[in-house]
From Swiss-Prot:
EC number(s) on file: 3.6.1.12
Lineage, broadest ranks: Viruses, Duplodnaviria, Heunggongvirae, Uroviricota, Caudoviricetes
Organism: Enterobacteria phage T4 (Bacteriophage T4)
Superkingdom of the source species: Viruses
InterPro entries reported for this sequence: dUTPase/dCTP_pyrophosphatase
Record keywords, A-Z: Hydrolase
Entry's Gene Ontology molecular function annotations: dCTP diphosphatase activity
Gene: 56
Name of the protein: dCTP pyrophosphatase
Catalytic activity field: dCTP + H2O = dCMP + diphosphate + H(+)
Length: 171
């Protein structure tokens, strides 16, 4: 489980991240593709140093991909629980923060009604980092299927258009 501000200290590097983002745009690169590449390289590194980690470029069979996807889903589930807990203000400690999703806790209603914009900047940042943690594993799913940013955009565009059409037609 997450610990208070486990990732919040990373914000000290935000200037470097901002400069990197502007450099990526200045080089006319796609930020999503850069993130996919970064995640792929991390997974390759893990596969090279830990024999039990899958190499994303060596997923050859449907079974390999099923195993890869299940691992990513398990990780997403774990990170999602951390995200929910962080919405209960990690500055209170993990046990107290979990009241936001544990209906049997005395502080449940209070935690549920707390406005995000009234939380400390550190608590708000922890929430965002937990969502980014989930995004890592979503990126891994795309990487495992060998998808690039252009393909993701095209398929997303088509599916989003279809979803609007469905809504227009009483879906």
């Amino acid at each position: 489980m997450a610990h208070f501000n486990e990732c919040a200290h990373l914000i000290e590097g935000v200037d470097k991240a901002q400069n990197e983002y502007w450099d990526i745009l200045g080089d006319e690169k796609d930020p999503l593709q850069v993130m996919l590449d970064m995640q792929r390289f991390l997974q390759i590194r893990l596969a090279n140093v830990r024999e039990y980690c899958y190499h994303p470029d060596k997923l050859e069979t449907a079974g390999d991909v099923v195993s890869w996807m299940r691992e990513q889903k398990d990780c997403i589930d774990d990170e999602f629980r951390e995200l929910l807990t962080s919405l209960g203000e990690m500055s209170r400690g993990e046990k107290e923060a979990s009241a936001v999703w544990k209906k049997w806790k005395a502080r449940y209603i209070e935690a549920q009604e707390k406005r995000i914009d009234e939380m400390s900047p550190e608590d708000q940042l922890e929430i965002k980092f937990e969502l980014v943690d989930i995004f890592h594993f979503v990126l891994n799913m795309f990487v495992g299927l060998g998808m690039n940013a252009e393909e993701i955009f095209k398929l997303y565009y088509l599916k989003n258009k279809h979803n609007f059409e469905r809504q227009d037609n009483g879906y």
